[in-house]
From Swiss-Prot:
GO molecular function (one): RNA binding
Name of the protein in question: Maturase K
Subcellular location: Plastid, Chloroplast
Organism from which the protein derives: Vigna subterranea
Keyword Cell wall biogenesis/degradation assigned: no
């Protein structure tokens, strides 16, 4: 067991004096310059949370004892002088920036062995391997397990996870101060809400950092168990043909299981497990017996309950068969139906009927979630009828057409691998008429009049045809190729999933 504990000692760079860039204010500005966030983008921060304000606040921290007042008067909201609640939010934003920079440098800097990490996690940084996985491996798997990641985690568990990385004592005093302050603040105004409700709405950077750190911790343990179980060597037992030796075999098995951990993992050798984390959920895809699948289910539950002190019931993990279950994944609606075909075979004077079961992958564009996403972004109403975008009405005609065309191309590029494209054509119709209504609203004209004008100028050809899809890869033979081929094409240059998938 000691040799496996050595594997569980994860490679962590334990930082000392992590609060130095925050308190010595000149360093944080230099650190943050040129190091944009690797983990999040378009977070919609309020303008008041900027590095300049954090820098000014650090100057005031030396002039007055704000932390003492901040710790004692958490229920007060001053109207004259300093607003400590406002300052605490700014400090927390600056704290999140500093910690994120340090961890991003560890993951992506060559000086901290970042090249090895990038090579080992190369498949996790892009979406290239998802579509070949659909075609080549998914149809040969049997079961799928939906895992809802339990949170919020207890705050002290988060601090313990951070202690593996950081040795700065003042850092833990500060972060406990923040947790205590916001917990008391939320319990005073909203007694039934957790602290993560506040973090997720107002301090998204530090919330995402802590959440990703928590998920990374349990995924590291799970991947360790999965890798060790698949790399175990076979341990053969003697074959006992007589019944009198049966109990001797059981006794021998129990003794081995209690002495060495590797023999207990023997039962999980050569299992086919594919793990994907997507939008707060994890997906495990198996090709094995239900007995082993249930064992991994209980491993997950015990890991959360024993290691993270989070209650996770059996309803947290759902196991379903592919042949009887369809699911949403990365913006697609996937199903693997069983197609039964009968083949007649004749041998001499005898004829046989052979039934062959063939699995086929169906990738369908989910029309209802996409229409809901378009309704939230004001491209159509809740019934799916196109509406104009008044926010874009002050732009030029070229910018309006360019924006709609870019969105339409992204949809075409992402969903061209769908087997049934009727839903995709409906989405394209909504975008096309939303563009026309926006232009007609700008020029104070009717839709019919402006549609005739655009048709005469041939400005909407790319909305009406699909040649622009093939021109992205086949610029010369796009017209001929697009006319004769209407099959499923996966584009392997997609780096990010479609933005509208976030609203699913």
């Amino acid at each position: 067991m000691e040799q496996y504990q050595a594997y569980l000692e994860l490679n962590r760079s334990r930082y000392q004096d992590i609060l130095y860039p925050l308190f010595f204010r000149e360093s944080i500005y230099g650190l943050a310059y040129g190091h944009e966030s690797f983990f999040i983008e378009n977070v919609d921060y309020n303008n008041k949370f900027s590095l300049l304000i954090v820098k000014r606040l650090s100057t005031r921290m030396y002039q007055q004892t704000h932390f003492i007042l901040f710790a004692n008067d958490y229920k007060k909201n001053t109207f004259v002088g300093y607003n400590y609640h406002f300052y605490s939010q700014i400090i927390l934003e600056g704290f999140g920036i500093v910690v994120e920079i340090l961890f991003s440098l560890q993951l992506f800097s060559s000086s901290l062995r970042g090249l090895e990490i990038v090579k080992s996690y190369k498949n996790l940084q892009s979406i290239h391997s998802i579509f070949p996985f659909f075609e080549d491996k998914l149809i040969y798997l049997n079961h799928k397990s939906d895992i809802r990641i339990p949170y919020p985690i207890h705050l002290e568990i988060l601090v313990q996870i951070l202690r593996y990385w950081i040795k700065d004592v003042s850092f833990f005093h500060l972060i406990r101060l923040f947790f205590y302050y916001y917990y008391k603040l939320n319990s005073f105004f909203f007694p039934k809400k957790w602290i993560f409700t506040f973090f997720s709405k107002r301090n998204r950077r530090i919330f995402l950092f802590l959440y990703n750190l928590y998920v990374w911790e349990y995924e590291s343990i799970f991947l360790f168990l999965r890798n060790k179980s698949s790399q175990l060597q076979l341990k053969h037992f003697r074959v006992f043909f007589q019944r009198i030796f049966f109990y001797e075999k059981i006794k021998h098995l129990v003794e081995i299981s209690t002495k060495n951990c590797s023999y207990t993992l023997f039962f999980f050798k050569d299992i086919f497990i594919h793990y994907v984390r997507y939008q707060g959920k994890s997906i495990l895809v198996f090709k094995n017996t239900p007995f082993l699948i249930n064992k991994w289910k209980y491993y997950y539950i015990f890991l959360w309950q024993c290691h993270f002190d989070i209650w996770a019931g059996l309803e947290t993990i759902y196991i379903n068969e592919f042949s009887q279950y369809s699911f949403h994944f990365l913006g697609y609606f996937l199903s693997i139906p069983l197609n039964l075909s009968v083949v007649r075979s004749q041998m001499l004077q005898n004829s046989f009927l052979i039934k062959i079961v063939i699995k086929k992958l169906d990738t369908i564009v989910p029309i209802i979630p996409l229409m809901r996403s378009l309704a939230k972004t004001k491209f159509c109403n809740v019934m799916g009828h196109p509406i104009s975008k008044p926010v874009w009405a002050n732009l030029s005609d070229f910018d309006i057409l360019d924006r709609f065309l870019r969105i339409c191309r992204n949809f075409s590029h992402y969903y061209n691998g769908s087997a049934k494209k009727k839903s995709f054509y409906q989405i394209k119709y909504i975008l096309r008429f939303s563009c026309i209504k926006t232009l007609a609203r700008k020029h104070k004209s009717t839709v019919r009049t402006y549609l005739k004008k655009l048709s005469s100028e041939k400005l909407l050809e790319e909305f009406l045809t699909e040649e622009d899809l093939f021109s992205l890869i086949f610029p010369i033979t796009s017209f001929t190729f697009g006319r004769f081929y209407r099959g499923r094409i996966w584009y392997l240059d997609i780096l990010f999933r479609n933005d509208f998938v976030n609203y699913f």
